[in-house]
UniProtKB/Swiss-Prot annotation:
Compartments where located: Cytoplasm
PANTHER family: TRANSLATION INITIATION FACTOR IF-1, CHLOROPLASTIC (PTHR33370:SF1)
UniProtKB keywords: Cytoplasm, Initiation factor, Protein biosynthesis, RNA-binding, rRNA-binding
Lineage: Bacteria, Bacillati, Mycoplasmatota, Mycoplasmoidales, Metamycoplasmataceae
Cited InterPro entries: NA-bd_OB-fold (IPR012340), RNA-binding_domain_S1_IF1 (IPR006196), S1_domain (IPR003029), TIF_IF1 (IPR004368)
PROSITE patterns in the cross-refs: S1_IF1_TYPE (PS50832)
Example GO molecular function: rRNA binding
UniProt-listed Pfam families: eIF-1a
Ligase is among the record's keywords: no
Superkingdom assignment: Bacteria
Positions of the S1-like domain: 1-75
Descriptive protein name: Translation initiation factor IF-1
Subunit annotation: Component of the 30S ribosomal translation pre-initiation complex which assembles on the 30S ribosome in the order IF-2 and IF-3, IF-1 and N-formylmethionyl-tRNA(fMet); mRNA recruitment can occur at any time during PIC assembly.
Gene name linked to the record: infA
Length: 75
């Protein structure tokens, strides 16, 4: 996903429904689709914690719509 320009990445909002470990999450998007997501590198560096029920912004590659990357956690 890192090699695509920003215009080609799809951004969605969703809610964290399941935590697998510190870096893997299941997110349900606003349209009801469930994705397996991991957190972005900047969120790892800044130790941003995500728990069940958090609203997040998810970035999805148009080539693989089953996986996503959490790029922002709403306050």
């Amino acid at each position: 996903m890192a090699n695509l320009p920003k215009e080609q990445k799809l951004l969605f909002q969703g809610k964290v429904t399941h935590v697998f470990n510190a870096q893997e999450y299941e997110v349900t998007l606003e349209n009801g689709i469930k994705l397996n997501c991991h957190i972005a590198g900047k969120m790892k560096i800044h130790h941003i914690k995500i728990i069940i029920g958090d609203m997040v912004k998810v970035e999805i590659s148009p080539y693989d719509l089953s996986k996503g990357r959490i790029v922002y956690r709403f306050k």
